[in-house]
């Protein structure tokens, strides 16, 4: 296995232009494919997840052209639901942002033509990532979805019986991606859909991204305080002609944290008016003691005396991981709460984070839905080999350990290709050893 050792970094300074957001990229491609008209998607992320979505759309008969650097994609919208030849199988890797929305969108296919089945599968880890809450909701809306192996998990078989709509209940407590998938499919259902949320809805800012994007593609949703969503049926998405993908606010977190710990770093491509909830990560850094400056198209973090915090971070689950490694450089303990959904991501992130933080010298308590971190003294960091569990965010979070007086070795550094293939190049560009 490839390993990368980062030597201790004494200072960071510079500007990082962020790659496009993964969740925005894949939502934009899917909406563009379903919409009427041609959409030019710009600042598209070039990563594994996006490649899986593009491959799937091509197999589903969507025509698109991709620029040489893969940052611009011109998509010819179908203006209707997908259709396919019986027996088609789509391999979606470990891309939750492709698997969930496509599962719902494929249920729209109508059997006016010949009955046809499609199979959605992926890497072994994908078969461990729950999808039951989404499938339960789709079944209530009249879809025909079956599990091919373990109940509640991919791979799935979907038949083209159409999506009727009607009253649907969905559990909101595990992942907002299930609701996002259902919301994006609902306007093209035969009838109006009324979605009732069971339990506390997690990651609300991700739902705001979805609703915002649907509006750009000419569909409005009646959001009743995140408890109920009413979507009119039989609608058609309309191309906005151009859709600019914002820089990835989750990816911004590593560089902003580095600035807060040891220098001054500006990230561009995301700013104070961003539609991504993870921009709020900068406010958490500010609470800890960093100096933050907000621009229209940038956020800047400057070193401050950092103190530990105790905070519910359900609203920024991906960026909250970066707080866990930032906590190594704060005075006193940090507690990150209400993050059960870390357990159903690319790996069980709660368990992985606790294990790897202990290796570098922290005292850690791992709860069912929280993590408590007591940092090591500044001269007590240990050189460790960090397992990354094929999880891009683990690799990027633990790069911050190099801001101590101790080197850190990252196993399988190329796993960052899921969202940020050039991460380590960008990180070394702002670092002074």
Curated annotation (Swiss-Prot):
Belongs to the EPSP synthase family. It is an enzyme of class 2 (transferase). It comes from Mannheimia succiniciproducens (strain KCTC 0769BP / MBEL55E). Pathway: Metabolic intermediate biosynthesis; chorismate biosynthesis; chorismate from D-erythrose 4-phosphate and phosphoenolpyruvate: step 6/7. One of its GO terms (biological process) is amino acid biosynthetic process. NCBIfam families: aroA. The active site is at 318 (proton acceptor). This is 3-phosphoshikimate 1-carboxyvinyltransferase. Its EC number is 2.5.1.19. Gene3D superfamilies: Enolpyruvate transferase domain (3.65.10.10). Monomer. Keywords: Amino-acid biosynthesis, Aromatic amino acid biosynthesis, Cytoplasm, Transferase. Catalyzes the transfer of the enolpyruvyl moiety of phosphoenolpyruvate (PEP) to the 5-hydroxyl of shikimate-3-phosphate (S3P) to produce enolpyruvyl shikimate-3-phosphate and inorganic phosphate. Its main location: cytoplasm.
């Amino acid at each position: 296995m490839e390993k990368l050792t980062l030597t201790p970094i004494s200072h960071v300074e510079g500007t990082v232009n962020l790659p496009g957001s993964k969740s925005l990229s894949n939502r934009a491609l899917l909406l563009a494919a379903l919409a009427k008209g041609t959409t030019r998607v710009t600042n598209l992320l070039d990563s594994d997840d996006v490649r899986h979505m593009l491959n799937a759309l091509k197999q589903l008969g969507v025509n698109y052209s991709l620029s040489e650097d893969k940052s611009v994609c011109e998509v010819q919208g179908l203006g209707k639901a997908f259709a396919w030849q019986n027996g088609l199988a789509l391999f979606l890797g470990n891309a939750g942002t492709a698997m969930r929305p496509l599962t719902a969108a494929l249920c729209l296919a109508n059997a006016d033509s010949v009955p046809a089945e499609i199979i959605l599968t992926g890497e072994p880890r994908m078969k461990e990532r729950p999808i039951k809450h989404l499938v339960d909701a789709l079944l209530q809306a009249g879809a025909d979805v079956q599990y091919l192996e373990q109940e509640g998990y991919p791979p799935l078989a979907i038949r083209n019986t159409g999506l009727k709509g009607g009253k649907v209940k969905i559990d909101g407590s595990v992942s907002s991606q299930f609701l996002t998938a259902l919301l994006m499919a609902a306007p093209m259902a035969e009838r109006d859909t009324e979605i009732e949320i069971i339990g506390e809805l997690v990651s609300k800012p991700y739902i705001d991204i979805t609703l915002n994007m649907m509006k750009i593609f000419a569909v409005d949703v009646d959001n009743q305080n995140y408890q109920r969503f009413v979507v009119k049926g039989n609608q058609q998405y309309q191309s906005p002609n151009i859709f600019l993908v914002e820089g990835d606010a989750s990816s911004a977190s590593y560089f902003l944290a580095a600035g807060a710990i040891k220098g001054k770093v500006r990230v561009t491509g995301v700013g104070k008016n961003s539609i991504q909830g993870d921009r709020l990560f900068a406010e958490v850094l500010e609470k800890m003691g960093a100096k933050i400056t907000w621009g229209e198209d940038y956020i800047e973090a400057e070193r401050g005396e950092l103190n530990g915090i105790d905070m519910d971070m359900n609203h920024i689950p991906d960026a909250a991981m970066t707080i866990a490694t930032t906590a190594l450089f704060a005075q006193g303990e940090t507690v990150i709460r209400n993050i059960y959904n870390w357990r159903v991501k690319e790996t069980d992130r709660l368990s992985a984070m606790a294990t790897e933080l202990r290796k570098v010298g922290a005292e850690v308590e791992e709860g069912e839905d929280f993590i408590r971190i007591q940092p090591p003294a500044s001269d007590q960091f240990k050189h460790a080999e960090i397992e990354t569990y094929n999880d891009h965010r683990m690799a990027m979070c633990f790069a911050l350990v190099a801001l101590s007086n101790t080197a850190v070795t990252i196993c399988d550094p190329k796993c960052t290709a899921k969202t940020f293939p050039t991460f380590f190049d960008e990180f070394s560009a702002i670092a002074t050893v």
